[in-house]
UniProtKB/Swiss-Prot annotation:
Coiled coil: none annotated. Keywords: DNA-directed RNA polymerase, Magnesium, Metal-binding, Nucleotidyltransferase, Transcription, Transferase, Zinc. It comes from Citrobacter koseri (strain ATCC BAA-895 / CDC 4225-83 / SGSC4696). DNA-dependent RNA polymerase catalyzes the transcription of DNA into RNA using the four ribonucleoside triphosphates as substrates. This is DNA-directed RNA polymerase subunit beta'. Mg(2+) binds at D460, D462, D464. PANTHER family: DNA-DIRECTED RNA POLYMERASE, DNA-DIRECTED RNA POLYMERASE SUBUNIT BETA. One of its GO terms (biological process) is DNA-templated transcription. GO terms for molecular function: DNA binding; DNA-directed RNA polymerase activity; magnesium ion binding; zinc ion binding. Belongs to the RNA polymerase beta' chain family.
Length: 1407
């Protein structure tokens, strides 16, 4: 029997292959695949249901319908295998050959393949250099094309209409050759000399200067070279032979009632065959040209529809008016072959059921219903029953299991022991959505889930369902246990923090037991230890919250890792002493000696993991959960209406607000404020009132007054149930309590605008009808948003996974010295993210020095773990250069040092880890939590007043970076540079706060001066931009002509007059070319020079500038010459949330991007056009100046004569990532994208490690554009894989040749996924047709490097445990020792089979 199995295994042996190539099929190739020509459109005989001969299901071509049996029934049984029946011509073999044998149709006239014709850019059109319209007119028989001009004046490829053709025939006779239809195009393609054409084009490319022409030429050269190199022939894009798909892949299925369901392909094939046969007949009869032509056109259309229905003209529809599904539709889209059957398969040995809570389970267990387990583990049970001799055959075992005999359950118990199962909850947004557990058999029909893993699954018990999968092989079980067990996934891969964290009831229970209460029963006792505390509590002698003294023994690890005991008397409460009993050895008592909220518990588990490792943490987590549940039950915390205490002040606050609103309304009616101002003010008033009410309410809820032991009143934190739930972090928030007991506040309309009448009632008082109606607005919008958000978030995740799927850690250290400089994230006065959080788990790129000395604090290539980070903090280091995947030098993949710590495991990452997918999941998974549109938080709270000063919060010294300044007449500094930053440095040299200081700010304190906390250090006018003089002297007006360039305005109230510069649009013709400016001269009337340059101090005034000086006035440096009003309220709606993240990763250009300086130099303005200004930057070194046209309405940040550096902002706006990359480099764009993405997530309180975003940025930067080819084979302007250029340049430099120069490109994630080198991966993502067309023409090889390609071809992925297998395969192939597959011929096999069968018959049945 063993030999038989061996033989059957040998039959299904797959070939070892390393790459997949796609190319055009030549007619001969198609004929070589084919097993015969399909000549008739018939499918099966309606009476006998046997396939018709030569038809679409013909058994002679495609193989027998029944296993080992010919059609007429002459040969049956295995012994005739391989015989071809002389009566019906069918080979006797297995039916499954009908899935792999192809046929063909010999087309009577060539037809163009629609993909190469219509998939843009049209390959045929590009190759022939003809417009697509013309080619189509030829193909569909509307005009002629000249193939050979001969001695006539007709050009090759010239298009002739019917009339022109007839005229030419009369004139030239047979001198020339012109045809129509696909034959003509085929002839043109055949007669092309590709190499010759390439040469001509390359010469042309070197001569031409026009940009568009060069682009077109490079496109053609690339296509021609692709044809030359891949060995494809252009004429193969025209089909002369059409392959026919094997019949079992387009089946005809009999339905009941004698009807048949058929695949649409059969209809499409039938049309082609019918038209082809008709055309053959017409050609034999030598029918008139016009009839033949029409038939040929119809054949072309039929073939088009078969290949890609609907690509040209109207789609051919079936009987039910639905377009037929063509071959192209079979593979593309969500229901296509790639995404439906290759990337997502359904698997056997799985089941699904509803989940319920299993609070008594251990962390590694799940409850599995007996019924399910019995079904899932059937084969194992059969095996065991046979092994034990309880059943003689499988059949008997089956019967036993069906009868559910008692012994079966015992066997099931054994089988299930230590056999993990996988639990999965859809949607699986990250890898923690599938984890392994050991099953525990339970009664009932619902799966029981451990409460602590709910956070990872995002599961709740309101009817969620989960699927169970059984890992069958030993390897699978091993992987499930070692890698996927829930106990091995304590930390989240997104941020390295524990994800097995108690929530809700457990938190409430722990919080309740660790709270203290004034004057509780048993206060002041002194106890010998936690055990006694528990005893007293159980006996009812002391309350859980009583403040007592307890003797506590703590254990601390010494240098050798041994535990040292330390006993002391601690002030604590009974509850905390009881909780201490479950805390593992090695943690300090201070960790539980506090009221434990959710954050504190999370920190406790994190500390436990870092100090003690995995096993104690898992046990501790379980114990915490049991304890939490127990004490939550004892606490009796519940929600009652009396817990919602409405503050007394509420009424008066609301009436005050109403009075203010009435006042504003009066002002509006008397015309003092505009409608917009009134609306804004009203909303501000209500937002403030709302805050006051909620503050009063929280103060009221937070504390209660009690009598202490000495009979005095004392404030203590309240034991109000609702407050406790919110305070502990178990459920609810201040905002929700506000709606219950304060006031509901302002509501938003569905479009995001705020309704100005707030809801003053709360839910305890109840809403009236109007208020209820307003509320429904917001509620419905919430639901609609959620639905949209989920879909959008899923799509973002899909794009991210696709772009990063092939990124795997492939080596230990690439040795690069490059890296990213990490600094703490500081916004305004607060540190949003300290340095330690940013560098923890990264590897240093260079030695970190002790600040102010040359001592090495941390050497290069050190993985910064917690202890190193403590050291950095102690020495107040505020910038560390760390390795990053963006600057990693590995060719394919990245190295472990550039990535750093594996966040989910806590050590440096292993080789073979799929970091790309992890990054994509970490960014995509919280996507559903991000709001679609940033809801105005609490209405108008997000609308802050315009900033006009900087007030520091801490004491320290000021440091100004890239600041230029002058001292004004009152001795204060005035800033005259654009992007000045002010940092506050504490006494250890750490940056505490950081602010942007605008141009024209007056500084109260200078660089390096000490300030106290709360001091204002800079002031400016937020509504105008000043023009500041850098020199002292007298003002001289130039080109300031009243009525032409300026106009005088007088203020009615003050009587002061000022000059206003007219915008060029408002000027008269005479004033158009004048450029109003203020010149500073000395007493003799000579120009004053700007210090440090040889430029005269002349300040050109932009339009709308207001001048409050008169000609000839004396001024001193730092004075304001003019003010340019800024359009305030120009804050456009910032896209927030998910769409913003998508925009960043898609690298979309913002609508009105900031304009950056392309080169460093001096600014001047050239000649203006109607709507634009000409900005000229002249480099200091005297090289070519750079010009750029800028629309006049853009506000410029620079004045004439100012010096800018490359990449400085010339005009404000959102920065375009492409500009940042071009002008400031890779690190700057990485920093930009990382910070912007983090801002969105931070706003939602989601923590994601920077490296995940960096991984995606690396993938966005994986293409480069060749600027100068050097000695390489690249084309100028060609876009190639960055790693390819790197490898090519390395080889060239090794041989002493000149490498190619290039610039890095930033692609959006969709573009980057489609531009990947693997066509299989790109085709399975989007735009399948285009990708495959392109790949086929270029004859691309897919090296199967990524994960997706390997999943599609059905082998282990080159990551994780499959990494070793692939490495091994490569190594063996390099050594040339791939084992040859044992060749079993059919003859040997049949002989051994016959032998076996005979032996089986002859022998007895009991073996």
């Amino acid at each position: 029997m063993k030999d038989l199995l061996k033989f059957l295994k040998a039959q299904t042996k797959t070939e070892e292959f390393d790459a997949i190539k796609i190319a055009l099929a030549s007619p001969d190739m198609i004929r070589s695949w084919s097993f015969g020509e399909v000549k008739k459109p018939e499918t099966i005989n309606y009476r006998t249901f046997k396939p018709e001969r030569d038809g679409l299901f013909c058994a002679r071509i495609f193989g027998p319908v029944k296993d080992y049996e010919c059609l007429c029934g002459k040969y049956k049984r295995l012994k005739h295998r391989g015989v071809i029946c002389e009566k019906c011509g069918v080979e006797v073999t297995q039916t499954k050959v009908r899935r792999e044998r192809m046929g063909h149709i010999e087309l009577a006239s060539p037809t163009a393949h629609i993909w190469f014709l219509k998939s843009l850019p049209s390959r045929i059109g590009l190759l022939l250099d003809m417009p697509l319209r013309d080619i189509e007119r030829v193909l569909y028989f509307e005009s002629y094309v000249v193939i050979e001009g001969g001695m006539t004046n007709l050009e090759r490829q010239q298009i002739l209409t019917e009339e022109q053709y007839l005229d030419a025939l009369e004139e030239f006779g047979d001198e020339f050759d012109a045809k129509m239809g696909a034959e003509a195009i085929q002839a043109l393609l055949k007669s092309m000399d590709l190499e010759q054409e390439c040469e001509t084009l390359r010469e042309e490319l070197n001569e031409t200067n026009s940009e568009t022409k060069r682009k077109k030429l490079t496109k053609r050269i690339k296509l021609l070279e692709a044809f030359v190199q891949s060995g494809n022939k252009p004429e193969w894009m025209i089909l002369t032979v059409l392959p026919v798909l094997p019949p079992d892949l387009r089946p005809l299925v009999p339905l009941d009632g004698g009807r048949f369901a058929t695949s649409d392909l059969n209809d499409l094939y039938r049309r082609v065959i019918n038209r082809n046969n008709r055309l053959k007949r017409l050609l034999d009869l030598a029918a008139p040209d016009i009839i033949v032509r029409n038939e040929k056109r119809m054949l072309q259309e039929a073939v088009d529809a078969l290949l890609d229905n609907g690509r040209r003209g109207r789609a051919i529809t079936g009987s039910n008016k639905r377009p037929l599904k063509s071959l192209a539709d079979m593979i593309k889209g969500k229901q296509g072959r790639f995404r439906q059957n290759l990337l997502g398969k359904r698997v056997d040995y799985s089941g699904r059921s509803v989940i319920t809570v299993g609070p008594y389970l251990r962390l590694h267990q799940c409850g599995l219903p007996k019924k399910m387990a019995l079904e899932l583990f059937k084969p194992f049970i059969y095996g065991k029953l046979e092994l034990r001799g309880l059943a003689t055959t499988i059949k008997a075992a089956k019967k036993m299991v069906e009868r559910e005999e008692a012994v079966v359950w015992d066997i099931l118990d054994e089988v299930i022991r230590e056999h993990p199962v996988l639990l999965n909850r859809a949607p699986t947004l990250h890898r923690l959505g599938i984890q392994a557990f050991e099953p525990v058999l339970i009664e009932g029909k619902a799966i029981q889930l451990h409460p602590l893993v709910c956070a990872a699954y995002n599961a709740d018990f309101d009817g969620d369902q989960m699927a169970v999968h059984v890992p069958l092989t030993l390897e699978a079980q091993l992987e499930a246990r070692a890698l996927m067990m829930s106990t091995n996934n304590i930390l989240s891969p997104a941020n390295g923090e524990p994800i097995i964290v108690p929530s809700q009831d457990v938190v409430l229970g722990l919080y309740y037991m660790t709270r203290d209460c004034v004057n509780a029963k048993g206060e002041g006792m002194v106890l010998t230890g936690p055990k006694e505390a528990e005893r007293i509590y159980r006996a009812g002698l002391a309350s859980l919250h009583a403040r007592v003294k307890v003797r506590i023994t703590e254990y601390e690890k010494d240098a050798n890792g041994e535990f040292v005991a330390k006993t002391s008397l601690k002030d604590t409460t009974i509850g905390r002493a009881i909780l201490w009993m479950i805390v593992p050895k090695g943690l300090p008592f201070s960790i539980v000696n506090q009221a434990l909220g959710k954050k504190a518990i999370s920190k406790m588990l994190n500390t436990c993991y870092r100090i003690l490792g995995l096993k104690p943490t898992v046990i501790f987590a379980d114990q915490t959960m049991y304890t939490g549940f127990a004490y939550a039950a004892r606490s009796g915390a519940s929600v009652g209406i009396d817990d919602m205490v409405i503050p007394e002040k509420k009424h008066e606050i609301i009436s005050e607000a109403e009075a203010e609103v009435a006042e504003i309304q009066e002002q509006f009616q008397s015309g003092l404020v505009t409608a917009g101002e009134r609306y804004n003010k009203v909303i501000d008033i209500w937002a403030a009132a709302n805050d006051r009410v909620s503050k009063a309410m929280m103060d009221n809820l937070q504390t209660e007054t009690v009598i202490n032991r000495d009979g005095q009143e004392e404030q203590q934190v309240s034991f109000n149930s609702i407050y406790m739930m919110a305070d502990s972090g178990a459920r609810g928030s201040a905002a929700q309590i506000r709606q219950l007991a304060g006031m509901r506040g302002l509501m938003a309309k569905p479009d995001g605008s705020i309704i100005e009448t707030p809801i003053t009632a709360n839910f305890r008082e109840g809403l009236n009808v109007l208020q209820y109606f307003i509320s429904t607005h917001g509620a419905r919008k919430g639901l609609a948003d959620t639905a949209l958000k989920t879909a959008n978030s899923g799509y973002l995740t899909r794009r991210l996974v696709d772009v990063a799927q092939d990124l795997v850690v492939t080596e230990d250290d690439c040795g690069t010295h490059e890296g990213i400089l990490m600094t703490p994230v500081i916004e305004g006065g607060d540190v949003k993210e300290p340095l330690r959080d940013r560098v923890l788990g990264r590897v240093t790129a260079e030695d970190v020095l002790k600040p102010g000395t040359a001592d090495i604090l941390v050497p290069r290539n050190t993985l910064l773990h917690e202890q190193w980070c403590d050291l950095l903090e102690e020495n107040s280091v505020d910038a560390v250069k760390v390795r990053s995947v963006v600057s990693c030098d590995t060719d394919f993949g990245v190295c472990a040092h550039c990535y750093g710590r594996d966040l989910a495991r806590g050590h440096i990452i292993n080789k073979g880890e799929a970091i790309g997918v992890i990054a994509a999941q970490s960014i995509g998974e919280p996507g559903t939590q991000l709001t679609m549109r940033t809801f105005h938080i609490g209405g108008a709270a997000s609308r802050a007043a315009a900033e006009s000063s900087i007030q520091v919060k801490n004491k320290g010294s000021i440091r100004l970076s890239n600041a230029k300044s002058v001292v004004n007449s009152s001795g204060k500094l005035v800033i005259t540079s654009r992007n000045t930053e002010l940092k506050l440095i504490d006494e250890f040299g750490r940056t505490k706060e950081s602010y942007k200081v605008p141009y024209g700010s007056v500084m109260a304190k200078g660089d390096g001066e000490q300030v106290a906390g709360g001091e204002t250090v800079a002031n400016w006018d937020p509504h105008t931009m000043p023009v500041i003089t850098e020199v002292s002297g007298f003002v001289r007006f130039t080109d300031m002509i009243d009525g032409q360039t300026i106009t005088r305005q007088t203020d009615e109230l003050t009587g002061l007059s000022s000059l206003v510069v007219l915008d060029s649009a408002e000027r008269t013709t005479g004033g158009k070319d004048l450029r109003p400016a203020l010149k500073i001269v000395d007493a003799q009337g000579n120009d004053v020079l700007i210090p440090g340059t040889d430029m005269p101090a002349q300040y050109f005034l932009p339009g709308k500038a207001i001048v409050q000086l008169e000609d000839g006035v004396q001024i001193s440096s730092g004075d304001t010459l003019a003010r340019v009003p800024q359009e305030s309220g120009g804050t456009k709606d910032i896209t927030g949330g998910l769409p913003r993240v998508a925009d960043l990763f898609e690298a979309r250009r913002p609508k009105e991007p900031a304009i950056l300086a392309e080169i460093s130099g001096i600014i001047s303005f050239g000649k203006e056009t109607k709507g634009k200004r000409r900005l000229v930057i002249t480099p200091v070194d005297g090289s070519e100046p750079y010009e750029e046209m800028i629309p006049k309405w853009r506000q410029l940040n620079v004045f004439e004569g100012e010096r800018v550096e490359r990449g400085d902002v010339v005009s404000d706006g959102p920065e375009a990532p492409h500009d940042i990359l071009r002008l400031r480099g890779v690190h700057a764009v990485t920093r930009y994208i990382v910070n912007e993405v983090q801002d969105v997530y931070r706003l939602q309180g989601v923590k994601i490690n920077d490296k995940h975003i960096e991984v995606i940025v690396r993938q966005m930067l994986r293409k480069a554009t060749i600027e100068n080819a050097g000695s390489s084979d690249f084309l100028e302007g060609e876009q190639v894989e960055y790693s390819r250029v790197k490898i090519a340049n390395r080889d060239l430099e090794a041989n002493g040749k000149v490498g190619a120069t290039f610039s890095r490109d930033l692609l959006g994630i969709t573009k980057a996924s489609l531009a990947t080198e693997s066509f299989i991966s790109a085709a399975s993502f989007q735009e399948t047709t285009r990708v495959l067309t392109e790949a086929a023409v270029a004859g691309k090889r897919d090296e199967l490097r990524g994960l997706k390609e390997n999943v599609i071809v059905g082998r282990l992925i080159p990551a994780g445990t499959g990494y070793a297998y692939h490495q091994d395969r490569m190594r063996r192939r390099a050594a040339g020792e791939l084992p040859a597959a044992p060749q079993v011929t059919a003859e040997d096999a049949s002989a051994s089979l016959a032998e076996l069968l005979n032996a089986g018959l002859g022998g007895s049945d009991n073996d």
